[in-house]
Design a protein with these regions (language model features):
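The feature marks helicase ATPase cores and/or their adjacent C-terminal helical subdomains
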Residues: 1-625
Length: 625
C-alpha cells in the first residue's frame, strides 16, 4: 500500500470470485487481470482494444465499493466519455454496489464535469457570477454576433472566426497576437457574457486552473475527499488536462493513489487540427494487457501495422474466425464514391445472416471517417474530403450532446434517439433532464437549476425531500417513451410536466408557451417487410434489390466510435492536408517505414478505426488516374 488511509482495503481471491459472479456473462479473470484488480499502487495499465479494460476497472470499483470504509471520502473515476459509467449501470445498476458507486461520496464522470463541479463552479460563484449555460459552440456564436459587422469583417480577413471569442491559455487572453481596439472589443464581449452566465467548456477548465494556482488548499481538500483516482481512457488526456490533474492530485503516492487505464495508440484527443503529443501516459513500469478479446488474430495483425507502441496486440479466436471473412479494401474512382457505401452494405449481407445482424444489432455496422464536418465545398484535388462526400445526407451535428435546442420536445426526441442507439435509458434521462432544466430556468427567469455534471441530480437538489420521490416517478414516466412522439402523446406528456412544475412552484405562462409547443419531426422512414420504422439520423438503410434483405449502416467520425465495438466497420478515405490512405498506405505494407514522421495523429486515428470491428474490417482508397 502507498497511503495509510487505504491500508485496510485488501482485495482477496474471495473478492475476485464474488465479482466474477456479480458481473455474470461468464466473466472470468486470468492471472494477469487478477493482478491488475488487486494492485493498489500508483501505476498505469496499457490495455489494447478489446482487452476488457473497462470490465476490469468496473470489477475493481465494485470490490472497492463493497469494502469502502468511509462515509465522506470517495473513489474518483474520470474519463472523456461515459463508457465506464454506462458499464457500471449495465452490470451493477440493479444492485446495492452499483447504486453506491453511482452516488455520494463517489464521483464517476468526465474530467470536465469533475473540475466544473469541484473547482470551477465554486470558484466562479465566489466571484459573484452565476452560471446559466456552458456550451462552446453556442456561446462563441453568441459573442461573435454581438461584435459589430465591421469587427467581424476585419477578423474574417485575418482568418479568424467564432472561436476567437473565448479565453485561450489563461483567463483574460485570446488567440489574437495584436492588441488594440479589436482585442479590447472581444474581451469586453467575453466579460459581459460571462456576467450574464455564459461560458465555454474550455473557459471552465481555465477557471479551474486559476483556482488551483491561487489557492493551495484546494488540492489538499480534493485529495482528502478522493484518496484514490482512476482515469479511464487516460491516453486522451491532453497536456493541459494533465497539468490540471497534477495540480489537483499533487501528492500522488503520498496523499492519493492514481491509476490510468488506456491505450497510448489511441491518443487522438478531440481536435484533429491541434498537435498535442503528451508523454504523461503510460508512466514507466506500466502493466500491459495485450490480448484482445474483441477480434481474432487477422484483424489484430492488420491493426498492428498502424500501432505506434512497441508492444503488439494479440487477437483471440471467436465465432467468426472460421468463416474466412474477406476483409476488404474498396478501390474506387472519384465519381463512384457513393457507390462504396452500397458495396459495403452488400458485403455485409453476403458475409452475415439476418440472424447474426440482428444478434449484433446493438453493436451495428458502421462507416467512419477522420474528417466529417463540412466547412466548404470540396476542391477537386481533395475529393473525397470528408464523410459528406460519400453521402450528402450526413449531418455531423445531428445528435451532439452539447446541442442547445429551441424547443423542449427536441430534447425528448434526442433522448429517444440515444436510447434506440445504445439501449441505455440513462442517456434518455440525461436529455430529458437538460430540457427540464431549461424549462424551469425559463419559467423562473433565472439560473434556478445550476449547471453540473449530473443535471438530474441538480434538479433533485433544488426540491424539498418530500417532493423528490414524486419527481423521480414523473421523470420515470416521461422516459418510458421509446418510439416517435405523436402530437396527442406530447399533450399527454405536457400534462405530466405541468404537475411536475408545481413541485417547483411553477405554472405554465406565456413566457414558456413557445418553448413547450409541439413541432413536427423530420419524416425519415423506411419500409421493412411491411412495417414502417423511423430511420435515425446518420443511418443509411441498404437494401439488396434481389433478396430485399436490408442492413442499417450508421455513419460517424472516428472520434465518435472510440471505445465502441462494431460487427463491421468501413474506414473511409478522407483528406486532411493529404489523403489519409495515401499517407499511411506504406505502413500497411510488409515493409513499413522506419520513421513515423508527421503521421502520428493520422496513424492513431486509423488505429482507433481499425480496432472497432469484431468480424469485418474494410478500408477504401481513391483510385489514382
Amino acid at each position: 500500500m502507498e497511503i495509510d488511509r487505504l491500508k485496510e482495503i485488501e482485495i482477496t481471491d474471495e473478492d475476485i470470485q464474488w465479482v466474477e459472479e456479480t458481473l455474470g456473462h461468464e466473466v472470468h479473470f486470468d492471472s494477469t487481470r487478477v493482478n491488475i484488480i488487486k494492485n493498489m499502487y500508483s501505476v498505469d495499465i496499457q490495455a489494447f482494444p478489446g482487452s476488457g479494460k473497462t470490465t476490469i476497472l468496473v470489477a475493481k470499483l465494485a470490490i472497492l465499493a463493497k469494502k469502502w470504509p468511509y462515509d465522506n471520502l470517495g473513489i474518483c473515476v474520470l474519463s472523456h466519455t461515459n463508457v465506464a459509467r454506462e458499464e457500471i449501470e449495465e452490470r451493477l445498476g440493479n444492485n446495492e454496489i452499483g447504486r453506491k458507486l453511482l452516488s455520494y461520496p463517489h464521483f464517476i464522470g468526465t474530467l470536465h464535469s469533475f473540475f466544473d463541479t469541484y473547482v470551477a463552479l465554486p470558484w466562479i460563484r465566489s466571484k459573484g457570477l452565476n452560471i446559466d449555460l456552458i456550451n462552446t459552440e453556442y456561446v462563441n456564436f453568441l459573442r461573435w454576433m454581438r461584435l459589430s459587422y465591421e469587427t467581424r469583417y476585419y477578423l474574417k480577413r485575418q482568418r479568424k472566426n467564432e472561436s476567437i471569442c473565448s479565453y485561450k491559455g489563461c483567463i483574460g487572453e485570446i488567440d489574437l497576437d495584436k492588441g488594440g481596439e479589436t482585442k479590447a472589443k472581444i474581451l469586453d464581449v467575453i466579460e459581459k457574457t460571462q456576467k450574464e452566465g455564459y461560458f465555454t467548456f474550455d473557459e471552465m477548465l481555465l477557471y479551474a486552473k486559476q483556482a488551483l494556482e491561487e489557492l493551495d488548499g484546494i488540492s489538499s481538500s480534493i485529495q482528502q475527499r478522493f484518496p484514490i483516482l482512476f482515469i479511464d481512457e487516460a491516453q486522451d488526456t491532453d497536456s493541459f488536462q494533465w497539468d490540471l490533474l497534477e495540480k489537483a492530485f499533487n501528492k500522488d503516492g503520498i496523499c492519493s493513489i492514481r491509476q490510468g487505464y488506456g491505450d497510448s495508440n489511441q491518443a487522438i484527443y478531440n481536435n484533429l487540427y491541434v498537435d498535442d503529443e503528451s508523454s504523461h501516459f503510460p508512466r514507466e513500469g506500466a502493466l500491459v494487457l495485450n490480448e484482445s478479446m474483441r477480434f481474432d488474430s487477422r484483424i489484430a495483425k492488420l491493426a498492428n501495422t498502424v500501432a505506434l507502441s512497441k508492444e503488439r496486440m494479440d487477437g483471440t479466436e471467436n465465432v467468426f474466425s472460421e468463416g474466412k471473412i474477406a476483409h476488404t479494401i474498396f478501390l474506387f474512382q472519384k465519381d463512384k464514391a457513393p457507390q462504396v457505401i452500397d458495396e459495403f452494405g452488400q458485403l455485409i449481407l453476403n458475409t452475415f445472416s439476418d440472424k447474426e445482424i440482428s444478434e449484433y444489432q446493438k453493436e451495428g455496422c458502421h462507416v467512419v471517417g477522420m474528417v466529417h464536418c463540412k466547412k466548404e465545398d470540396t476542391p477537386e484535388k481533395q475529393f473525397p474530403k470528408g464523410i459528406y462526400d460519400y453521402w450528402e445526407l450526413y449531418e455531423p451535428e445531428k445528435a451532439s450532446k452539447s446541442m442547445v435546442h429551441k424547443f423542449l420536445i427536441q430534447y425528448f426526441r434526442y433522448g429517444i434517439i440515444e436510447f434506440q442507439r445504445s439501449g441505455e435509458r440513462s442517456l434518455q434521462v440525461e436529455w430529458i433532464s437538460k430540457g427540464l432544466r431549461r424549462l424551469i430556468n425559463k419559467a423562473k427567469k433565472c439560473n434556478y437549476v445550476p449547471v453540473s455534471g449530473n443535471i438530474f441530480a441538480s434538479l433533485l437538489k433544488v426540491l424539498p425531500d418530500d417532493c423528490q420521490t414524486d419527481f423521480r416517478k414523473m421523470v420515470y414516466e416521461l422516459s418510458g417513451t421509446s418510439d416517435a412522439i405523436s402530437k396527442s402523446k406530447w399533450n399527454s406528456m405536457l400534462g405530466v410536466m405541468k404537475q411536475m412544475l408545481k413541485l417547483f412552484d411553477i405554472t405554465i405562462s406565456q413566457d414558456i408557451e413557445e418553448f413547450i409547443k409541439w413541432i413536427d419531426e423530420e419524416n425519415n422512414e423506411v419500409q421493412d417487410g411491411g412495417k414502417i420504422g423511423k430511420v435515425l439520423p446518420n443511418h443509411y438503410i441498404y437494401t439488396d434489390k434481389e433478396t430485399q434483405r436490408i442492413v442499417d449502416i450508421e455513419f460517424g467520425s472516428i472520434h465518435s466510435v472510440k471505445g465502441r465495438t462494431h460487427l463491421a466497420t468501413l474506414v473511409l478515405e478522407t483528406f486532411l492536408k493529404t489523403h489519409n490512405m495515401k499517407a499511411i498506405l506504406k505502413f500497411l505494407c510488409a515493409t513499413p517505414p522506419k520513421s513515423v514522421g508527421k503521421n502520428q495523429k493520422r496513424l492513431r486515428c486509423q488505429y482507433v478505426a481499425m480496432t472497432r470491428a469484431r468480424a469485418l474490417l474494410c478500408l477504401d482508397r481513391v483510385k489514382l488516374l
